[in-house]
Amino acid sequence: MNWKDRTELLLGKERNDAICSATVLVAGVGGVGGYAVEMLARAGVGNLIIIDDDVVKESNINRQIIATAKNVGTSKVELMKERILDINPQANVLAIKSFIDEDNVGEFIRRFKPNFVIDAIDSISPKIALIKYCIESNVKIISSMGAGGRMDPTKIQYADISKTTNCALARTVRERLKKQGITKGLPTVFSTEPV
């Protein structure tokens, strides 16, 4: 049995083929983004673009899938690329060591034409730039809000940005997007657990 056969049994051939040929861009491969990329690789997503300018720090070891004592100081995207290819050697993986900002976000989206974008950025301005560009360009995106300090997995929710509660990052994102004329249309994952 091929390792992708179980996904095909679950989703059917047509959906499995779509996953295998999909292009997903993940911005931020630390805590949330690292686990998202791992699951995309295990699902068989054929084309992954991973963007992050950070290196592994000792403080990442307790929560980031790629962080170990051995690789402190190493580029997160290079480590993640290696991990993806260990899972699926046939995957096309482009690791870009860069921050996303207003000046380069359009270039990344136009150049790679992702079917889907996962925003796992933890800095406000780059997060807003990516979200705004994707919404205005009709590129499917989901955005991760604040997870730090939360411990109750039953409080994790999926909702439009306009419906988020109890999350300081979501509130800030909502306010900044509103100034840009965006009040809804952004799927998010957030926690209702008070910090």
Task: Name these PLM-found stretches.
Residues 116, 120-195:
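E1/E1-like adenylate-forming module used to activate ubiquitin-like modifiers
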Residues 98-99:
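Conserved acidic residues
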Residues 32-33:
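Hydrophobic/small residue at the entry helix of a nucleotide-binding pocket
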Residues 93-95:
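Hydrophobic/aromatic anchor residues within beta-strands of the central parallel beta-sheet
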Residues 1-25:
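N-terminal charged helix/coil linker that caps or initiates catalytic domains
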Residues 47-88:
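Glycine-rich phosphate-binding loop and adjoining beta1-alpha1-beta2 segment
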Residues 103-114:
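Short amphipathic alpha-helix with an adjacent loop that forms part of the alpha/beta core around
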Residues 26-28, 51:
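Conserved N-terminal Rossmann-fold NAD(P)-binding element of oxidoreductases
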